[in-house]
Every structure is written in C-alpha cells, then in structure tokens.
C-alpha cells in the first residue's frame, strides 16, 4: 500500500467527520484566521502542503494531532 500523504490524511479526516472545505474555512474565520477557498482546495488536492501555523489551525479545527496530519507519525487522536 502506498504511503499516505498530507492531503490523504486531510481528506480522510474531513470525510470521517463529515466536514466540507467550506466548514473548515468558516471555522478558521471563527478563530480569527483567514483561510481562502483556493488555499484550502490546494491542500485537499495535494498541490501544496501548508505552513506549520496553518497545519496547526487545520489540526485544531479537525481535532487531530498536527504531527500526524503533517507526517503521519503520531496517533490520530484528539489534539
């Protein structure tokens, strides 16, 4: 089996939690952070990997460990 990528883990987590890209964007705004539609789409599609601060924001919103989200190295448990 091929190794999972950041986008694989992001998509799977969003699917498991029934969260859409627009939900993540809205949640980021509620936390006082700006996350654009294009930016989010690029993360989900695997075109780009977020900076650490953005990955921490995504992990917080999705309630997963940031290390796992970025590298797959930690448990998927709550952040």
Language-model features: where?
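A short, Lys/Arg-rich alpha-helix, primarily the initiator
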Residues: 1-26, 56, 67
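Short, charged recognition helix plus adjacent turn
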Residues: 2, 18, 60, 70-79
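Residue-level detection of the helix-turn-helix DNA-binding "recognition helix"
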Residues: 15, 29, 45, 74
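Residues within the alpha-helical elements of helix-turn-helix
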Residues: 16, 27-32, 61
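Recognition helix of helix-turn-helix/homeodomain-like DNA-binding domains
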Residues: 30-50
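DNA major-groove recognition helix of helix-turn-helix
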Residues: 39, 44, 54, 70-73
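Short, basic-rich loop-to-helix N-cap that marks the start of a DNA-contacting helix
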Residues: 45-60, 76-78
């Amino acid at each position: 089996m091929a190794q999972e990528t950041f986008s694989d883990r992001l998509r799977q987590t969003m699917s498991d939690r029934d969260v859409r890209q627009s939900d993540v964007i809205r949640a980021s705004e509620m936390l006082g952070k700006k996350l654009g539609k294009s930016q989010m789409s690029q993360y989900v599609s695997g075109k780009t990997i977020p900076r650490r601060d953005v990955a921490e924001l995504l992990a917080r919103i999705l309630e997963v460990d940031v290390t796992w989200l970025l590298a797959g190295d930690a448990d998927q448990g709550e952040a």
